[in-house]
């Protein structure tokens, strides 16, 4: 049984300009004291074509963590535009929140992210070189995809085989505020793209 359960994720400052930091309010519960730190990461998927464009925006160690319910705001700077292919700057991508214990990832929460120009003229005639200062980022906070992995939580034991992750489409999620208009891709296309990054790496 997992010793940590993520109860709630609130997407803050959404929608927002591209260069604003990502902010997530995370609530989790430990069923017993943890002797080592939890490592949380925020990962931005720069391109659906290859994981080489993934950017780890930030990582933070939390712990040792006593039993009980805990909440913190995880903030990370916007991705480096220079590492995002021009063809993937505008449109839908993915941001991931992951957590590991003793180097083993046990949960991954993925959100669709839509980057688009707010000005009508730029939407109709987008520049060849993306202007990130004019882009707005909109996280689809109402539709996260959650994958949980089986790991060994105890000391001095071999790592469990986590090659068969359990996908859960629903987590208690809130947004302040959230919006889902203007998404240019079909739901099937979005699911294929997100699930490709929700597999165990």
UniProtKB/Swiss-Prot annotation:
Gene3D superfamilies for this protein: Histone chaperone ASF1-like
Keyword Disulfide bond part of the UniProt annotation: no
An annotated GO BP: DNA replication-dependent chromatin assembly
Keywords: Chaperone, Chromatin regulator, Nucleus, Transcription, Transcription regulation
Entry's Gene Ontology cellular component terms: chromatin; nucleus
InterPro entries in the record: ASF1-like, ASF1-like_sf
SUPFAM superfamilies membership: ASF1-like
GO molecular function: histone binding
A Pfam family that the UniProt record links to this protein: ASF1_hist_chap
Location of the protein in the cell: Nucleus
Function according to Swiss-Prot or TrEMBL: Histone chaperone that facilitates histone deposition and histone exchange and removal during nucleosome assembly and disassembly. Not critical for histone deposition during nucleosome assembly.
Subunit comment: Interacts with histone H3 (including both histone H3.1 and H3.3) and histone H4. Interacts with hira and p60.
Family: Belongs to the ASF1 family.
Name of the protein: Histone chaperone asf1a-A
Organism listed in the record: Xenopus laevis
